Amino acid sequence: MTHNAVQTSVADTVPPFDPETFWTLFHHATVAVNGVRLHFVEGGSGAPILLIPGWPQSWYTWRYVMPLLAAAGRRVIALDPRGMGDSDRPASGYEMRTAAADLHGFVEALGLTVNGPLDVVGHDVGTWIGYAYAAEWPEDVKRLAVFDAGIPGITPPAPAGIPSTEANVKTWHFAFNRLDDLPEILLQGREREFLTWLFRTKAVRPWTITPADLDEYVRVNAAPGATRAALSYYRHKLGPEGLAHSHARAERKLAMPVLAFGAETGVGAMLVDTMRLVATDVDGGVFEGCGHYMPEEAPRAVAEQIMRFMSA
């Protein structure tokens, strides 16, 4: 299969986050959807584009990309899905059907599809949610862009046996996160140490996540119930019901255009190959010289590829 290679470098980074400048362009807001309060950050004007983060992050993962998209003439909305960031952390509702319904309710509450379907972008677990949303509510989604994730139940599983050191570093958390109780026992109170290790290990340019950025991620991950809530996505997605829903969803191929890029030291070409199993119109490939945290490690390249795709 054909894969596009996008070479990334330090030139694709931006200066460290400047709150004073950022908050002149964007603002916090919340909306009640499906019985939960969802937090989001938005700004800019034009056709809306919805950004969905992954684990263990929040809307904040998009902070470098958002001004670039707004400058390109888009209304940019970065959402904290239930259980993430500053959204509510209920005891249930972390299966993909509910996550997709949350997005549909959120989009309706904000009137984002009044003028037609909107563009949706996901990273990591945000890719799971964005794909499920596009599959469950295809009339809502004009185009879907996804970054660095495998999709359990659709992405072919790794060969059985002891994984290589490289593979283990990339995938160990799938088995760990789905365990009941143990992750909470080990992680609560040690969020800073854990996140420091995670960002250092999975990033090619870990310095793009500054000490101030780490403080923000520690804040949302150390909040009461945050670890359990975020890991509930893995527990549902990797369980029998979640996998069955993935298989059923894959039988209805997406008709809207899809952009899929993995990171060279992340999932690589696996994501675009995965999306070609579930969609009929797929573009994408690999960000070379980039780690898993693509919106932070190469925000200029991420924004450029999004706008290229969504301007076609």
What are these regions (language model features)?
Residues 290-303:
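Catalytic histidine-centered segment of alpha/beta-hydrolase-like enzymes
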Residues 58-59, 128, 290-291:
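A short, glycine- and basic residue-enriched loop/turn
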Residues 41-86:
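Conserved HGGG/HGGXW glycine-rich cap/lid loop of the alpha/beta-hydrolase fold
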Residues 2-41, 48, 77, 84-121, ...:
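Flexible "cap/lid" subdomain of the alpha/beta-hydrolase fold that forms the substrate-access gate
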